[in-house]
């Protein structure tokens, strides 16, 4: 919905029925089914502290993630390998090929490699309008967070994929 609306210029019409809600912006209608039940307590999944907090250009990170994700087929993970001062994104699919690209990042400490579902990582980066994001990580087996660096409150929880050596 946020991507459909131009702030301060578009008017949003909202319609609610017993089992759905419809948002209309200009010629575009977005509908969603209403679900009964308790919303999951995602707050309990959010880690309290992180080993690494890296500020990265959203556009640069997203561009590289999209490009490398093309090689992550058949549930192949997108690998993020952190070493001193850099992040290498890679993916490979047998019989298709592999891709690798490196970004400069303010990483310090022991090298770390973590895997994410490429679609989920790209979706998280596409969901923010911030120029920079802060990637918050603990270790390869714990959830990570993508947070907008502009203080807008954007928060995206992403679960890792266990990597085979």
Specify the residue positions occupied by each region the protein language model found.
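Glycine-rich, pocket-lining loop/helix-strand segments that form or immediately flank
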Residues: 38
């Amino acid at each position: 919905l946020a991507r459909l609306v131009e702030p301060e210029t578009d008017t949003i019409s909202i319609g609610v029925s017993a089992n759905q809600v419809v948002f209309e912006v200009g010629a575009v209608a977005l509908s969603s089914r209403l679900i009964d039940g308790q919303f999951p307590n995602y707050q309990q999944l959010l880690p309290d502290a992180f080993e690494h907090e890296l500020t990265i250009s959203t556009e640069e990170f997203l561009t590289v993630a999209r490009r490398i994700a093309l090689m992550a087929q058949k549930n192949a993970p997108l690998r993020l390998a952190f070493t001193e001062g850099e992040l290498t994104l890679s993916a490979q699919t047998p019989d298709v090929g592999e891709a690798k690209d490196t970004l400069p990042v303010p990483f310090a400490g022991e090298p770390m490699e973590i895997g994410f579902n490429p679609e989920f990582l790209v979706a998280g980066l596409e969901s923010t309008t911030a120029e920079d994001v802060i990637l918050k990580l603990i270790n390869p087996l714990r959830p990570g967070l993508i947070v907008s660096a502009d203080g807008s409150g954007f928060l995206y929880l992403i679960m890792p994929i266990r990597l085979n050596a």
